[in-house]
């Protein structure tokens, strides 16, 4: 019999921390799917390293969420023993890898946000979150540089690479707005100086994205309509497939030891 999902006491700080941890875990898992399949060996290593950076961020955030919650949940339980509706990650990060251009555009959109986010979170009044932010910002800065180089290389490359990258931008753009939204519980943490106002990051994010997209001879969509729902547990079918693979061992053999 499969292991049942855990119950989580979602106080504002626990929920806020889990949302960021879920972003990192899900996107890190997506990048791990490229292992052995990247277009060149060097990029195979780069994608794996970025995935490991994100996994490290997820572990620290899950551990802190468990400490704050105080009900015995830890990083493994949060990762392996929650169902789809309990995950609160952005819809952007759960989107399938698609081709290499699609993966790079998704990573670029997220990394450009994460770099600004972690830089701002270094000023959080929560000492644990500010410490996690200091480490994560250094990693995110590298991710932005790496992805920016690929955006320009692909966009200003061959006719096919340009077309594939533009298609990826068009497909993923509607998932970017969710990064800058907040609910009442998050706004309360902003007021307390624990969280940061994500909406205030959008102008800086848009400048970074617009500059790189322009340099890559690509274009951003004109639509303002955005997808949302991930932060409240309403996900695409893609996350269910991802979690089925990610959680299969622990769900089938709970507490297994090697």
Each predicted region: which residue ranges?
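A contiguous pocket-lining binding segment that forms or flanks enzyme active sites
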Residues: 128-191
């Amino acid at each position: 019999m499969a292991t049942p999902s855990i119950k989580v006491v979602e106080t504002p700080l626990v929920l806020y921390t889990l949302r960021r941890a879920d972003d990192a875990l899900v996107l890190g898992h997506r990048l791990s799917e490229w292992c052995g399949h990247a277009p060149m060996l060097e990029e195979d290593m780069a994608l794996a390293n970025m995935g490991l950076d994100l996994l490290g961020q997820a572990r620290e955030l899950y551990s802190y969420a468990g400490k704050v919650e105080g009900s015995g949940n830890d990083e493994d339980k949060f990762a392996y023993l929650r169902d789809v509706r309990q995950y609160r990650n952005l819809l952007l990060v759960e989107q399938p890898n698609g081709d290499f251009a699609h993966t790079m555009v998704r990573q670029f959109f997220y990394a450009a946000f994460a770099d600004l986010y972690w830089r701002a979170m270094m000023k959080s009044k929560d000492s644990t979150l500010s410490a996690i932010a200091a480490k994560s910002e250094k990693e995110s800065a590298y991710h932005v540089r790496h992805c920016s180089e690929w955006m320009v290389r692909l966009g200003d490359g061959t006719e096919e690479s340009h077309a594939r990258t533009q298609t990826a931008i068009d497909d993923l753009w509607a998932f970017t707005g969710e990064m800058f939204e907040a609910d009442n519980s998050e706004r309360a943490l902003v007021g307390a100086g624990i969280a940061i106002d994500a909406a205030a990051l959008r102008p800086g994010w848009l400048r970074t994205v617009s500059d790189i997209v322009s340099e890559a001879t690509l274009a951003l969509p004109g639509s303002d309509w955005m997808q949302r729902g991930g932060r409240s547990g309403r996900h695409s079918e893609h996350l269910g497939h991802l979690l089925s693979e990610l959680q299969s061992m622990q769900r089938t053999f709970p507490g297994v030891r090697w």
